[in-house]
Amino acid sequence: MLQQIYDFLNINYNVSRETFNKFKEYYSLLSKWNSTINLVSATTLQNFWQRHIFDSIQLLNYIHNKDIIVADLGSGAGFPGVVLSISGIKNVILIESDSRKAAFLLQVAQLSDQKIEIINDRIQNLKVKCDIVTVRALANLSTILSHTKQFTVKDKYLILKGKNYQHEITQALLHNKFNYRLYKSCTDDSSWILEIKI
């Protein structure tokens, strides 16, 4: 089973054996911490590779240069931000308002060889400069755009969304101007990757 997972990651995302071992360590840390602060649901923890690693790493398909700054909003358990960092993104900013989750992020960030900054604060309190914003399971699109209006985003937003994506886009367009593209998620038929450029 693990060999098949490694082969998939290696073929599709050039994941080395060393990086794969870091993902295994990630799972161990997450399992340990999850019993006390509920970072992810027990069901998705059982499906760690597809639900969390594959779901996060697929964003690399839409990131064409690893020497960038990615700001990950509401990082929680570190998906997708920490996964992208372990996979080689040079600079990742993890923004998490819950201090217990920020403490977990501080520990799991040590698995990465790249630069990770953890900010324990609310998104709307910050002025962040980055190339790409990533978001997974945080808030509706209108809220995300409202909370980041003071950010300087050079390239785009990459947002993992579920089946209500079209309603969220329609609502957000009432108060915001942006161009968007939709890409099918490789992990769930009802999930999408929403790419937004403002």
Swiss-Prot record:
Which keywords does UniProt give here? Cytoplasm, Methyltransferase, rRNA processing, S-adenosyl-L-methionine, Transferase
Entry GO CC: cytosol
Residues that hold S-adenosyl-L-methionine according to the record: 74, 79, 123-124, 136
List the Pfam families hit by this protein, alphabetically. GidB
What InterPro entries does the record point to?
rRNA_ssu_MeTfrase_G, SAM-dependent_MTases_sf
Q: Name the EC number(s).
A: 2.1.1.170
Class of this enzyme: transferase
Catalysed transformations (reactions):
guanosine(527) in 16S rRNA + S-adenosyl-L-methionine = N(7)-methylguanosine(527) in 16S rRNA + S-adenosyl-L-homocysteine
Q: Please, which domain of life does this record's source organism belong to? A: Bacteria
Query: What is the protein's major site of localization?
Result: cytoplasm
Coiled-coil positions: none
Q: Where in the cell is it found?
A: Cytoplasm
Q: What molecular functions are annotated in GO for this chain?
A: rRNA (guanine-N7-)-methyltransferase activity
- The yes or no answer to whether the keyword Cytoplasm is present is yes
Does this UniProt record's set of keywords contain Transmembrane helix? no
The entry's family comment says: Belongs to the methyltransferase superfamily. RNA methyltransferase RsmG family.
Q: Which HAMAP family match?
A: 16SrRNA_methyltr_G
Name the job this protein performs.
Answer: Specifically methylates the N7 position of guanine in position 527 of 16S rRNA.
Protein name per UniProt: Ribosomal RNA small subunit methyltransferase G
| Species of provenance | Orientia tsutsugamushi (strain Ikeda)
